[in-house]
Every structure is written in C-alpha cells, then in structure tokens.
Amino acid sequence: MFVARRLSKNITQISKTAVKTSVRAVPVRGFKTTSVNQAAAPAPKTSQEKEYFEKNKSLLDKESNEESTEVDYSKLNENQGVVHQVIGAVVDVYFPHGKLPYINDALIVDDFQAENVEKVIEDLNNPSLKGKIDFNNVPISNIKLVLEVAQHLGDGIVRCVALDITDGLGRGALVLNTGSPLMVPVGQATLGRIMNVIGEPIDGCGPIPATEKRPIWRAPPPFADLAPSASILETGIKVIDLLAPYSRGGKIGLFGGAGVGKTVLIQELINNIAKAHGGFSVFTGVGERTREGNDLYHEMVEAGVIKKEGPGSKVALVFGQMNEPPGARARVTLTGLTVAEYFRDAEGQDVLLFIDNIFRFTQAGSEMSALLGRIPSAVGYQPTLATDMGCMQERIATTKKGSITSVQAVYVPADDLTDPAPATTFAHLDATTVLSRAISELGIYPCVDPLDSTSLMMDPNIIGVEHYKVATDVQKILQEYKSLQDIIAILGMDDLSEDQKATVFRARKIQRFLSQPFEVAHAFTNMEGRFVKLSDSIKAFKGILEGKYDHLPEAAFYMVGGIEDVEIKAAKLLESAGKEEKKTTTTSTTGQVKEETVREKVTRLVDEAYNAKVKKLKEYGASTAHLEELRAQYEKNFESEISQLEVLLKK
C-alpha cells in the first residue's frame, strides 16, 4: 500500500511539472518576448537551397526568433491569460499571476487591437471596478469569442466551454477575465428583436439599445416572495382546456416524439395566448431548426406581434439553434429566462415564456459533460442532470411582483417517457400535455393523449364541479372504449351489449371532437383555425355524453371548433349524401323516370347481392329451404342500416 501511494505521488508531481513546462512554452500574439535556446536550422544540401538560404538568411533568422520565444508574463495584468489548449468546444486558459476567474464567469478571447479594446483595458486596470469590465460600455460586436469557466484544473489553468465555434482559435491567444457571469441586454429594447446566447443581435437591424444588462446566472426568487396562482389560463384548444387545463403562472410541458406536432402546438399557443395577452412574451429557441425560427419571426411580423418600425412589439426572441456548439445551446435557455425575469421583477409584468425545446438544453448539457471528462450516468446523461434542470426551472416562478408562465416543448427520445431527460422534467411541471404517435396515425390533431395528459388544476375547488365532472366522464368513456378495442378487433361489434355499443359510438365521436383546426396550420390544411371558449367546450362534451348528438354522423365531429360547427358540418354531409341517395333514378317499364328512395335503393342492393349468391348456390345444388333462410338473414342485417339512414335524412 505504501509503495502504491508513493508511486501515485511521484506520478502526480511529474504531471504537474509537465503542465508547468508546457504552459511556459505558449507564445502570445502581440507581445515582444525574449529569445530562448532554439534548435539549429537544418543545413542546406543542394545548390538551390544554399542560394535561397543566403538570400533570405536575415528573414529566416527573424522568423525563427519570433516563433521560438518564451512569454514575458510581466506584460500581462492579473485579469489577463492566454489560451493553453483547444479541444473542440472546450478551451483551457492559463492565468500566470494566480488570480483565477470564478466558476461560470465569462472570459473574452480576441486579438485585442488597440482601437477595439482601449475601454476594456482601461476598465481592467481601474482599481475602482475591482477587475470587472463594465459590460454596458463594451460593444458586443467587438467580442470575438466568449468562454464560460467550468473547471479549475490547478497550476493556474481553468477549463472553459466556448459559447461559439472555435474555428481559427490557437494557443497563445489573449484572454480577458470579465470578473462576472455573461451579461445580456434586457428591457423593452429587446422586444421585437432576435438575439443569440451572448445578447448579440442576429436580425440584421443594428445593435440593441439596451440601457441595462443582467447576468444569466441568477438565484431563484426567495421562498417568501413566491405567490402561487390558482387561475386557469384559457388557450382556446378544447382538449387542453377541458382535460389538462393550464395554470396562469405555472410551468407547462408538451411531451412528444419526433414529428408529432410539438412546435405547431406551441406556435398555436403563441397565436392564441400571446396575441391576446396584454403583457410581454419571450420565445427561446433551444437547439431546434433555424427554418422554424425564421418562419415564426415572419409570422409574428405579419400578425403585428412584432413591429419592425417603431414601438409596440410584444415579444423578444432568443435563438441558439441546432447548428450551435453545445455551450450556446446549454446557455441560451438562461439568456431567454433572464430577459423574462427582468420583465417580471423590474416591470411587474405577467410574462409568457416559450421554450422549444427543453430536451435540447439537457442534450447540450450532456455533450458539455462528456467534453469536460465527467463520468456519465444513466443512458449517457450528465451526472448533474437533476441539478441542472432544477437550477433553471426554479427560476420560473410567480412572485408578488409578477409572474412567468412557461410553455416548454419536451422531445421524448424513442417515444419513451421513462427516459431520464423527460422524466426529470416531469417533476417540475404543473401540467403535462402528452402528444401520442398512435393518435397522430389516426389523423387526429392535435394528437394530445387525453388519458396520459395531466394537470394539477384538475380539482373541483379550482375549476368548478361541472367542469371536473364532465372531464372525468370524458376520460372514463375513453378508457372504456380503449378496453373494448381488443374485443371489437377479435369478435366485432355484434357481440357487444347495447350499452357497450352506445359507449363505443359516443367515445369515437368524443375522440374526433377533440381534434381542432389550427390557425398556424392553415397553409397546410386549408382550414380556418378555431378558438373555442372553455364554457362552450364543457357544454358540447356534456351533450355528447348525454346522447343529445347521437343522431349526428361521426364524420361531422372531425376537425371542427364548437358544437355549432358540428351541426353545420353534419347538415352539409347529409345534404351531399341526400343528393347522391335520393337523386338516384331508375327507368320504369313505361319509360318514365322516377326518383328512388333510400329504402328502395338498399332493397335493390340486397336483392342484387342475394341473387348473385343464389345463382352460385343453385350451381352447387342448394335446397329451397336453405335459400329462403339466406334471404331472411340478408333482410335482417340490412333493416337496421335502412332505419338509421332514414332517420338521418329526416333530420
């Protein structure tokens, strides 16, 4: 044991010595340095080489002296360091004077020509600022690369995560310690603008004239300042308002796999809530498609939510899309949250925060964790998964000053809700809306699963007794229908009792009535969007449960708004069916054309089918008694169909 410890200690000392040696060999661009022992240049061999060597001897000596130099660290102040190592999105920085930045502090990497950074250097050397840069006086366009400190490795080296691509970054680049976390612009100047993780505008409309900037790392509100709300946020979407209502000032999660409609649903919520919402909204695109962010921006401009000229914009956009490095995708959520917190705390607003997609936040954290060398936990996620999620989610809260209502899209890998990423998110949410691939395959949109979706607001003391009873009855009848599906698939509808048949018919109508056309999907469906009030939804579903609409065809309940739309669609369906059925004509023996009724047409079809089968049976020698029995069976089976069609036409 003693020998092993001694050997380990020696290895540690050797590695530390190697680190120190490698650090001293890092050249810094822009600093004159003293020469050190350098290897002799190889002797020229051919006559051409000798001639070239003689002509360019002085130039080669000068370049050799500049390249093989040792850093004169006396030229650096205590807030300056140099890039020691670059490994993709991870950058190691050496601070020679021993004053290391804190964890989560922002570092700036640049060539730092005098005309760009005179103010920065002045602030760094100003004792009154205690080493902190006044970010309000640093133009963001001068910042080439921002790093965030993640680890202290020892011997003056810190390991950082880059918030942008590191292409072209080399060892020896000068690094400045800002002395604080990343600061981003906040306030009404951000409304109508698109910015990235470091607060840089990316909409081509010039700099953001913000008067204040705030750090992206902040503590959650104190427990004494919290003021939970118990009021419903009406979305105008039937399945959500009825079965999994959202709370004002709560956290809402939209769970679903790839391609089931999370982004479309979140855009419809923006359309229905943000446009009618009196306060401000913040949309944060985390690791999603740049095309969707571009489309969303132009849709908001057309809708008047964003005004390119003059004041009046209601939403701020923060994007860190899927082409960004993991550092940007992991921190852009905090940037958007910081903007929303300012509106809540400083201006007392009720803010809407949309995040698409919160899974990409977790995924970026997993990538960063692997790059930093941490041992992964279950399914390859970072060991700090719960901590990272909690630090972000706890800042989304309702206080005595204002509220933040967040709607978060959550991608579910392989449609597995037990995956650690969505499972960790579940614990922080007030309402969960689960999008089902099985329902989307039926063509029902939004494909919200009414049995898996939940809400803490489903309490009769909050939503009212009538709403609670109708919602639970709807879920009950859908659950009964789900349990009967296996029996129907094996034995068919004939083996069900009359009550079970009524349950199936009403459940299928409810299932289709939960679909709804969206305004944001008008270009794809060619159907006008519908906003349905909660009171109308309760009344309509109550009527379906009581059997008031049993006479309406099932197809009339598909992709409509309120129950009035169902009745209008049913009338159109019956009218078109009547034209096809009633206007079918036959020619009598006298040559006159007469109108054929529904019963006559069905009877004619029965006769045709019967005669075709009788012809076959006679060929095989069937008895007359057997043929009469067959006739009675045909008439019995079609009698119910004839009666139903006649009732529909009379309506």
Curated annotation (Swiss-Prot):
Its EC number is 7.1.2.2. It catalyses: ATP + H2O + 4 H(+)(in) = ADP + phosphate + 5 H(+)(out). Phosphate binds at G259, V260, G261, K262, T263. ADP binds at G259, V260, G261, K262, T263, V264. Mg(2+) 1 binds at T263. GO terms for cellular component: mitochondrial inner membrane; mitochondrion; phagocytic vesicle; proton-transporting ATP synthase complex. Its main location: mitochondrion. This is ATP synthase F(1) complex catalytic subunit beta, mitochondrial. It comes from Dictyostelium discoideum. The gene is atp5f1b.
